[in-house]
Amino acid sequence: MVVFGLDFGTTFSSVCAYVGEELYLFKQRDSAYIPTYVFLHSDTQEVAFGYDAEVLSNDLSVRGGFYRDLKRWIGCDEENYRDYLEKLKPHYKTELLKVAQSSKSTVKLDCYSGTVPQNATLPGLIATFVKALISTASEAFKCQCTGVICSVPANYNCLQRSFTESCVNLSGYPCVYMVNEPSAAALSACSRIKGATSPVLVYDFGGGTFDVSVISALNNTFVVRASGGDMNLGGRDIDKAFVEHLYNKAQLPVNYKIDISFLKESLSKKVSFLNFPVVSEQGVRVDVLVNVSELAEVAAPFVERTIKIVKEVYEKYCSSMRLEPNVKAKLLMVGGSSYLPGLLSRLSSIPFVDECLVLPDARAAVAGGCALYSACLRNDSPMLLVDCAAHNLSISSKYCESIVCVPAGSPIPFTGVRTVNMTGSNASAVYSAALFEGDFVKCRLNKRIFFGDVVLGNVGVTGSATRTVPLTLEINVSSVGTISFSLVGPTGVKKLIGGNAAYDFSSYQLGERVVADLHKHNSDKVKLIHALTYQPFQRKKLTDGDKALFLKRLTADYRREARKFSSYDDAVLNSSELLLGRIIPKILRGSRVEKLDV
């Protein structure tokens, strides 16, 4: 029984297990970086995820719907729905709704593409993806998953953290902890930074988000001092800009559906130039010669945005620690976009960066760190990670300015209190409480996360005589970054503010779907065609009817399908299984587990 580490990403996700003092990554199609895609079959109770979902999305003979960009909708509610529509500009229909006992809304999404019109709730889609990924990984690791340590962007607010935690729990695998993505990456790089005498900046440039954290290390203890980031800045944005560049070069109307991930990765790691076929939606094709300097030029504005955030976070860290702003720091590069051409040299040129640390596998660092964190939960663990609150938590003054109760950078779990005095009050008086998350001085610019009216009689105040009543506001930040807000009366009676939880999916019926493994399906088809065409010393031909039937998509139960063929024979099929054994599945599937060196 093992706690798995999950890096739930915007573009790609990874899952890792820490077993026997070793880290292992799960692989699909010989890759540990699995697209955060879901395909829901409409005519069966099957679900495909990752690369399998991508394959099915392009097969017009398969009935169902394809979903992607799930993480980009986390945090969308009734207060910012229009902002999300403006930023994401989805071509599919969306709508707001409240799920189960949640007090705040989330979104229901129509499928991104597919052969059958479909829609599904965001919590249901995320939970389905997590369940399919973890259950398949558990089978590959040959161990039972008892819980999940999930990574989240450092810049997530408490509502986004609560939403993510609830989605993971809905999958059936309890979310035992959440770790900021840069913090998890730092933990996976512990052997490289534990001896560092200077602070370490963890630069996490992923597919959909950018995060940076400042970490100090002493032996095997890592403390997060400051964090920041941009929820709408990542490799996807560079992809979009690069697609526009390619189509302008080819003088064709832009087709945003084209996938350029292979081109970008090739230019980032392998080649300096190559020919790329640019195809319009009408099928017009133009071959374009692309070189690495073009990608670097397109990426440059996005890289500069990340560097601006790095400087702001480091300035905040130096100010809080009362250090000179030119104190030198090391910079650890993680995330898929950290391989961009020219990025290493540009980061090395930042005045306060004296060394850039490069990991053997920057993309797997977050999942590996989450799995390693399971060791931190043991009483005998030699490692300790102290994470921090990403934003100030504050109440409002009478001038609507922020009174900070939990400062950004505070270690979590954390409890902050603030005493207020209500003059001219008695048991029937009402206190209006509100808690804000954000770093602006003016409260209205921050995110209001809790609010409610409390009758003082409900917190132990008695009598009708007016007087000054001392009250205490208590803010608790849990180890997963979720928050509770309470009002405590003068005798210690406590009242939770905010009513129902923002996101509670405990009564949501996820439904039972079976993971459709295309590799098993394909290997079964190989066994079947071998059996249908086998005869001693030569191959026999299929009849036209059997050939037409075979070319149709078969269900997962290939033994049942086999009986539809006129040339089928039970004994021959059993022989084929013995002859092909485990070789064919391994060839078609590729390796499923990879050891991760840290």
Curated annotation (Swiss-Prot):
Gene Ontology annotations of biological process type: transport of virus in host, cell to cell
GO cellular component, one term: virion component
Assembly mode: Homomultimer. Interacts with p20. This interaction allows the docking of the latter to the virion.
One Pfam family this sequence matches: HSP70
UniProt similarity note: Belongs to the heat shock protein 70 family.
MF terms in GO: ATP binding; ATP-dependent protein folding chaperone
Highest taxon listed in the record's lineage: Viruses
This protein's record includes keyword ATP-binding: yes
Intracellular or extracellular location(s): Virion; Host cell junction, Host plasmodesma
Gene3D superfamilies tied to this protein: 3.30.420.40, Actin, Chain A, domain 4
Keywords annotated in UniProt: ATP-binding, Chaperone, Host cell junction, Nucleotide-binding, Transport, Viral movement protein, Virion
SUPFAM superfamilies registered for this protein in UniProt: Actin-like ATPase domain (SSF53067), Heat shock protein 70kD (HSP70), peptide-binding domain (SSF100920)
Record-given protein name: Movement protein Hsp70h
InterPro entries for the chain: ATPase_NBD (IPR043129), Heat_shock_70_CS (IPR018181), HSP70_peptide-bd_sf (IPR029047), Hsp_70_fam (IPR013126)
Function text: Transports viral genome to neighboring plant cells directly through plasmosdesmata, without any budding. The movement protein allows efficient cell to cell propagation, by bypassing the host cell wall barrier. Two movement proteins, p6, Hsp70h and three structural proteins, CP, CPm, and P64 are essential for cell-cell movement. Also plays a role in virion formation. Together with CPm and p64, encapsidates the 5'-terminal portion of the viral genome.
